[in-house]
Amino acid sequence: MYTALQKIHKDKDAEPTEFEENVAQALFDFENTNQEIKSDLKDLYINSALQIDVSGGKKAVVIHVPYRLRKSFRKIHPRLVRELEKKFSGKEVVLIATRRILRPPKKGSAVQRPRSRTLTAVHDAMLEDIVYPAEIVGKRVRYRLDGSKIMKVFLDPKAKNDTENKLETFAGVYRKLSGKDVVFEFPLTE
């Protein structure tokens, strides 16, 4: 029997939480009710899901998808996010690929760490996942006098209509997942 629990695969046989089961059930229902997207959703599953409080009393749903399936999820991203936001009314949905950060190799060891497993690379890729379908066109890091850093991220103005109302959510999700402050802006066009 094909059930909603097959839509979630946790690491090392960990039990899914109640919220993760709700997200998996929503994916399962969406697959069964929508015929045009059924073939795209058939083989897709998620790793985990969590709810994050964003400023202003808003909540965001962060869904971690397997790294290998991120291209398939991106094909149906706009429709899937729209449907999930309807299901979890008032909450914005963000899809992020699951990535691992490896610690730096010990001094004197010959082991090389791939660039894609460094903290910087994982955080940059996470930022791109969060703002998808908008594209990042530039970044600036501002150092304040007290030593704190704030990153300004410029998004593609073409996606302004779709993403303008979600910028606060994006910043809150990124701050929660990486611990870094970020401000999203659209560059001024002459």
UniProtKB/Swiss-Prot annotation:
It holds the Pfam family Ribosomal_S7e. One of its GO terms (biological process) is translation. GO terms for molecular function: structural constituent of ribosome. Coiled coil: none annotated. Keywords: Ribonucleoprotein, Ribosomal protein. One of its GO terms (cellular component) is small-subunit processome. PANTHER family: 40S RIBOSOMAL PROTEIN S7, SMALL RIBOSOMAL SUBUNIT PROTEIN ES7. Belongs to the eukaryotic ribosomal protein eS7 family. This is Small ribosomal subunit protein eS7.
